[in-house]
């Protein structure tokens, strides 16, 4: 018992956890247990459930590594997910209880990578709790289109898009497009261009697609029967996010990825979404971000949002 709260480690309370996530205005499907646990063998789970008597007030997706609690190393973002009716003071009391709980478990520090701001309800009270209890150790630049703003796509990209149909390009979306994209483009091109691998293997993303049929979509663009580029989309609430997006060598010469992005930008605008996130542009360069990726995403109509990574030192 931490103050008036009862804090429990997650231990197969899947239905309780998932029901809470689904009822929250500000959670995403990445916080559901089927997503968190698809690679559970890689992480020592330290997820927490916070109760007031029998009432679940908050959940905290997290993992433990070398005396540090992270929220969460296996997810794009983490942080506390609260019951929607809580006010700012109640949320800060829970944050304090979390720190006390992990201190009692001999944890040295807590690192939190919160949801980008556009996932949050506009009416939610803003707390300065982390500003006074932690330090910013990194700042990610997140590029996203705000559909409620007067966003503009660069005229060159629009010109290419306008030739999409007349030049014989075809766009397909189906579960089967995942294996086409992974096997024919994504794995090889990430290795060639960045000496990197996808975060998800093909079997993992297919398993996630089966669990989240409506939230994970794969769009590929073809010409003359050849796949040229693909974009993997994660959808939640009024936000869509491009999780992967890359072209083949031929597709790059034909600007196929630009055409596919512009197609999706208009598609999701017309479907009523508020934001289209294209992810971070941070890298290991001296600047800390890719100038080329920043320019590319800004030309697609994105603006910069920041995501602060917080570190709380736990003192004895």
State what each model feature region is.
Residues 3-53, 60-68, 114-144, 148-251:
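A conserved beta-strand-loop-helix scaffold within acyl/acetyltransferase catalytic domains
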Residues 43-45, 104-107, 216, 270-273:
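Short, high-confidence coil segments that cap the C-terminus of an alpha-helix
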Residues 60, 81-86, 92-99, 214-315:
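Aromatic (often tryptophan-rich) hydrophobic motifs at membrane interfaces
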Residues 68-73, 293:
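Short, flexible, mixed-charge acidic loops at enzyme active sites
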Residues 73-121:
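A gly/proline- and charged-residue-enriched helix-loop-helix capping module
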Residues 73-77, 138, 305:
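Short, solvent-exposed loop/turn segments at the edges of secondary structure
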Residues 121-122, 183, 286-288, 316:
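Short Asp/Glu-rich motifs
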């Amino acid at each position: 018992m931490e103050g008036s709260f009862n804090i429990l480690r997650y231990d197969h309370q899947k239905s309780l956890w998932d029901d809470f996530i689904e009822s929250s205005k500000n959670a995403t499907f990445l916080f559901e247990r089927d997503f968190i646990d698809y690679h559970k063998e890689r992480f020592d789970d330290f997820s927490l459930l916070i109760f007031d008597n029998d009432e679940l007030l908050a959940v905290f997706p997290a993992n433990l590594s070398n005396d540090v609690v992270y929220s969460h190393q296996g997810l794009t973002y983490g942080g506390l997910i609260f019951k929607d009716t809580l006010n700012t003071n109640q949320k800060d009391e829970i944050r304090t209880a979390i720190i006390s709980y992990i201190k009692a478990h001999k944890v040295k520090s807590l690192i939190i990578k919160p949801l980008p701001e556009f996932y949050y309800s506009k009416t939610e009270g803003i707390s300065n709790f982390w500003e006074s209890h932690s330090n910013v150790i990194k700042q990610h630049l997140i590029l996203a289109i705000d559909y409620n703003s007067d966003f503009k796509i660069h005229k060159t990209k629009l010109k290419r898009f306008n030739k999409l149909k007349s030049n014989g390009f075809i766009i397909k979306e189906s579960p089967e497009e995942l294996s086409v994209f992974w096997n024919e483009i994504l794995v090889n091109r990430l290795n060639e261009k960045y000496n990197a691998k996808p975060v998800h293997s093909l079997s993992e993303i297919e398993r996630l697609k089966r669990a989240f049929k409506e939230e994970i979509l794969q769009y590929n663009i073809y010409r003359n029967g050849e796949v040229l580029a693909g974009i993997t989309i994660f959808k939640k609430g009024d936000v869509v996010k491009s999780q992967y997006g890359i072209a083949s060598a031929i597709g790059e010469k034909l600007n196929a990825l630009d055409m596919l992005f512009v197609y999706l930008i208009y598609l999701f605008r017309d479907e009523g979404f508020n934001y289209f996130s294209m992810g971070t542009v941070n890298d290991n360069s001296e600047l800390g971000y890719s100038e080329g990726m920043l320019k590319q995403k800004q030309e697609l109509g994105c603006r910069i949002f920041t995501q602060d990574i917080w570190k709380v030192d736990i003192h004895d």
